[in-house]
Every structure is written in structure tokens, then in C-alpha cells.
């Protein structure tokens, strides 16, 4: 953590019951629909590509975003923005462009 405030904010979020409930729902729903989400994502990849060709982190970000888009009432623009932020933080340099493109095709 960069500073003391960021550390405190993290613990506040961890103790937020609504956030924990949503997080558990998100993980369970993503797992329950794993195969159908993979097929949907694959449909929008470059011709000849499979989802196994992209990194595990990119897969995870896409799967969770697809779950949020299809199964929740969250605004699609917000979901895509969060996915792009996560890709910038946890993936290769240009992965966020790829994630953004795939999710925009899905919505």
C-alpha cells in the first residue's frame, strides 16, 4: 500500500458486508457459468484464436466482467472501465486495449 489511508480503506472494504456478499455471488456465478462465458468470449476473439491463447489473468478479468454485464444490474460502461483498470494493473502493457475491445463487442 502506498500510504496509511489506502491501507485503512482496504480494511474498511474487507469488512463491508454488502461488498463481501456481492464478491461471493460474483465468484460463484462466474464459476457456475464458466463454460458459457468462455464460449461467448471466444466468439469475439480474432479468427482462429481460442480463449486458451490469452493469459490466465486476461481470462479472469474477461470472465468476471462478462458475469457482471450479463447477470447484474451494474452499468456496462462501469464494468468495462473496471476491467480496463484491472488489465492496466495486472496484465501486459497493451492488454487493456484487447480487454476493452472484446467487452465492447460483447455489449
Named regions from a protein language model:
Residues 1-96, 100-107:
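N-terminal interaction/assembly modules
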